[in-house]
Amino acid sequence: LSDISKSEAINTMAQGLKHTLKMLYQNEKIDGVIGMGGLQNTEICTAAMRELPLGFPKVMVSTVASGRRYFASVVGKSDIVTIPSIVDFNGINRVSSVILSSAVAAICAMAKEKQEICWAGPCKVIASTMMGVTNDTVVLASQLMKDKGFEVLSFHSTGAGGATLEGM
């Protein structure tokens, strides 16, 4: 890897992790995935996590999970649970040990209670978007659709919701 740029190395590692996680998931060898790191490790881990289905347990402990960073590039249209590390990763200390223990407890609980989303079913599905001033109308329209036998999935139009709806 010494002959390639840092961004190429990060992309290569992300592709390798995507392949590995996908294979482990398909062969039912993992019940969840947890990652930790700064910006580069966050990019590598979450690129692979985003390839796993909605509902599959995913936790990322990251130095960039809070603050002013725009987080769409990390989470995308996925359901990755992000936990701010608060301190940088420079060994285990009184702060990092508590944060990491909490993250491990979270992924273990998620894996134990894992329920993947079943997209097959007897009723038809309608998707809608909601945001602020449209809420009352969407709630009313949703009830009318439910009364006619539809399941209504309402997505917030910004953030992961809107992007997920567009990707369906």
What is the meaning of each model-derived region?
Residues 121-163, 167:
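Glycine-rich phosphate/diphosphate-binding loop of Rossmann-like nucleotide-binding domains
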Residues 1-27:
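Phosphate/nucleotide-donor binding subsite
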Residues 39-47, 68-69, 134-139, 162-163:
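Short glycine/serine/threonine-rich phosphate/pyrophosphate-binding segments
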Residues 2-5, 69-133:
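Cap/lid and interdomain-hinge subdomains that line or gate substrate/regulatory clefts
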Residues 27-41, 132:
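Short acidic, glycine-rich surface-loop motifs adjacent to enzyme active sites
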Residues 12, 16-20, 102-106, 164:
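Well-ordered alpha-helical segments embedded in enzymatic catalytic cores
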